[in-house]
A protein has these predicted regions:
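SAM-dependent methyltransferases
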Residues: 1-2, 196-198
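N-terminal Rossmann-like dinucleotide-binding module
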Residues: 1-43
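Short, surface-exposed acidic-centric catalytic microdomains
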Residues: 28-68
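Glycine/small-residue-rich loop that forms an oxyanion/phosphate-binding "nest" at active or ligand-binding sites
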Residues: 64-82
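Donor/substrate-binding cores of folate-linked one-carbon enzymes
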Residues: 84, 88-197
Length: 198
């Protein structure tokens, strides 16, 4: 059984999807043991507490350098014997030391169909705004392994959905979360935990 850490920065809707999937028995080869938040007071920590999962805060601004932040994060993960790291709306960039410690063991969910609307600065509503501004007819979500390139790791799963007339970035974001992200991320995590994806 793989010990999983979920890294978050906000409300934790993807975390909730993972917790719900686990509660339904959909990932018998993995267990969420730790939730790491990039700032205190985020609702994701409450979700963790409700599921009786330990939650901790590791803030980038508490450290003099990115390297010190990475070292603190890595220490936290190692202290909890974490095997798999899942970025679920985590807005801090992971440095090389963390990525090298977990080769093909860090997953990220991105709210667009990579290689479209990805890379530095493309998070939150921005990918949805960009898809609408470009006149795209479809969008979706991507789960990928994390490497040193922002949103550049190998793609594991993607799910597309239609962009409808009259969609706003907020409406599109909600639909992509409900129809793609909340389904894809638990599926990808279970596939990695079971060894189906290596």
């Amino acid at each position: 059984m793989l010990n999983i850490a979920v890294l978050v920065s906000g409300g934790g809707t993807n975390l909730q999807a993972l917790l719900d999937s686990e509660a339904r028995g959909e990932n018998p080869s993995g267990k969420i043991r730790l939730v790491v938040a990039s700032k205190p007071g985020v609702y994701a920590l409450e979700r963790a507490a409700n599921a009786v999962v330990e939650g901790v805060v590791v803030r980038r601004k508490d450290y003099a350098s990115s390297e010190d932040f990475d070292a603190a994060l890595l220490k936290t993960l190692k202290e909890h014997n974490i095997d798999l790291v899942v970025l679920a709306g985590f807005l801090s960039v992971l440095g090389p030391s963390v990525i090298e410690a977990y080769p093909r063991r860090i997953l990220n969910i991105h709210p667009a169909l990579i290689p479209s609307f990805c890379g530095p600065g493309m998070y939150g509503l921005r990918p949805h705004e960009a898809a609408l501004a470009r006149g795209c007819k479809v969008t979706g979500a991507t789960v990928h392994f994390v490497n040193e390139e922002c949103d550049g790791g190998p793609i594991l799963l993607q799910k597309a959905g239609d962009i409808l007339p009259g969609d706003t970035p907020e409406v599109l974001q909600k639909r992509v979360m409900e129809q793609a992200e909340w389904k894809l991320l638990p599926k990808a995590v279970a596939m990695v935990c079971s060894g189906e994806i290596k």
